[in-house]
Regions:
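A sequence-composition feature that detects small, non-aromatic residues
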Residues: 18, 24-27, 51, 67
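Conserved AdoMet
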Residues: 31-73
């Protein structure tokens, strides 16, 4: 299992590589949805808390959909 910070940064990077116009914003929105944590929680606990395999899978699935231009809403 990886830390939440590592997972968030990888998601943001995948969106950047896909040419997303706002990768940081989109990644944090999806992160907040999957992990039920806000940005402050990520900053405070992102390097110590780990994701479950299910959470990680769901997050990256949503990242890939967003990379293919699926709207956030």
């Amino acid at each position: 299992m990886r830390t939440l910070q590592v997972i968030y940064l990888e998601g943001k990077q995948r969106l950047q590589k896909a040419g997303n116009e706002s990768p940081a914003f989109d990644a944090i929105c999806l992160f907040e949805h999957v992990f039920h944590m806000n940005r402050q929680d990520l900053m405070l606990h992102g390097n110590t808390k780990q994701a479950t395999l299910e959470q990680e899978t769901e997050f990256f699935s949503l990242i890939e959909q967003r990379a293919k231009k699926r709207p956030l809403q």
